[in-house]
Regions:
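A short secondary-structure junction signal
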Residues: 113, 224-226, 294-296
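Primarily marks secretory-pathway-exposed extracellular/lumenal segments that are disulfide-
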Residues: 22-143, 313-319
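Short, surface-exposed secondary-structure junctions/capping segments
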Residues: 93-96, 134-142, 213, 268-290, ...
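Short, well-ordered strand-loop elements centered on a beta-strand within folded domains, enriched
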Residues: 99-101, 120-125, 248-260, 290-306
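Bacterial Sec-dependent N-terminal signal peptides
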Residues: 1-32, 36-37
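Extracellular low-complexity, O-glycosylation-prone Ser/Thr/Pro/Gly-rich "stalks"
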Residues: 281-319
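Activation on beta-sandwich/Ig-like modules and their edge loops
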Residues: 37-40, 48, 69, 142-281
Length: 319
């Protein structure tokens, strides 16, 4: 069960705003749209981010260029594309202000660019229908690298939640808590039991290690790897979230969640195309996941095996 996940960050950037058939199109066709993801919780560290530039016609930016500034200082000057795409890297700290300045060329409608974070996730874009100004202003926000790596809803009391520390350093878990709802949430978007499970100051999880919260009467194979007990874990239809400590019913920060904060789903929520995946199954986070879902359970659960962050195992499979 204690998998000691070895998460490797692979820059498999989803350059979804330039499909293959967008190259060599008519010069009057606008660049495709980009959906900008929501910023997420900060952590203290420096990261390398990416400026990714495209030309939908494939003949370069024809005199256009972009400058990128961090906290008012130009760090990338006169960046341009000579073919269909270009990639450059720059460093940011949490809270840095990132701005771009655009210089027009002959065919701006061919041009678009996006800023990706350290994990290949699109943070902002320009030169699209959503942002036709060709300029970006955003504040660098880093994900919290702590998340649920396993969840088990087994027979009888064989239940646990496993929390993984992917920060690269020792983590004091007292900064976090588990907040939950029972049989759906009484009020949509509000926790029935905020700060339901808390952690004593000095509860240290080593880098790359996990912390297991389990039912006190769970199987010996679970308790042998356990760190803390909790009587009321999920029966399949009870949402559990990793939150920042100090959560209240309607004021909280979700780092990761299993289940959603709406009505009772019935037996459980579907996961990876498996009906009632949170009921009578073990869920294991894929090794490609490096941070929590920030409360977006639907995207995390997915509707297909490939489109989910989770691997669904049979009940009582926690080997």
């Amino acid at each position: 069960m204690r998998k000691m996940l070895s998460v490797m960050v692979v820059f498999a950037l989803a350059f979804n705003f330039l499909a293959a058939d967008n190259v060599r199109k008519n010069k009057t066709e606008p660049a495709p749209s980009i959906t900008t993801p929501q910023n997420i919780e900060n952590n203290s560290r420096t990261e390398d981010w990416i400026l990714y530039m495209i030309d939908s016609y494939g003949d370069g930016w024809n005199g256009a260029s972009v400058d990128l500034l961090v906290n008012g200082t130009v760090v990338l000057d006169d960046q341009t594309v000579t073919g269909s795409e270009g990639t450059v890297y720059f460093s940011v700290d949490e809270g840095d202000i990132i701005e771009t300045v655009w210089t027009s060329g002959s065919y701006d409608n061919e041009c678009a660019y996006g800023i990706y974070n350290h994990y290949g996730e699109l943070q902002a874009s320009a030169g699209t229908e959503d942002n036709p100004t060709y300029e970006i202003y955003l504040i660098a926000s880093f994900p919290v690298l702590v998340f649920f790596s396993e969840y088990a809803e087994g027979t009888s009391n064989n239940k646990y939640l496993e929390i993984y520390n992917n920060t690269g350093a020792d983590l004091d878990l007292s900064a976090y808590s588990l907040s939950s709802c029972s049989n759906g949430c009484d009020e949509t978007g509000e926790f029935d039991y905020p700060d339901n499970v808390t952690f004593d100051a000095g509860t240290i999880v080593a880098a790359g290690d996990v912390y297991v919260v389990h039912h006190p009467d769970a199987d010996a194979a679970i308790t042998a790897e356990g760190d803390q007990t909790h009587q009321y874990l999920s029966n399949g239809d009870d949402a559990y979230a990793l939150t920042l400590a100090g959560a209240t019913a309607d004021a909280y920060t979700i780092v990761d969640i299993i289940g959603d904060m709406g009505d009772d789903p019935g037996a459980g929520w579907p996961v990876a195309g498996v009906d009632d995946g949170t009921k009578e199954h073990t869920l294991v986070r894929k090794g490609s996941v490096v941070h929590g879902n920030d409360g977006d359970w639907a995207s995390s659960a997915g509707v297909t095996e490939d489109g989910s962050e989770w691997i669904v195992l049979e009940q009582n499979d926690w080997t």
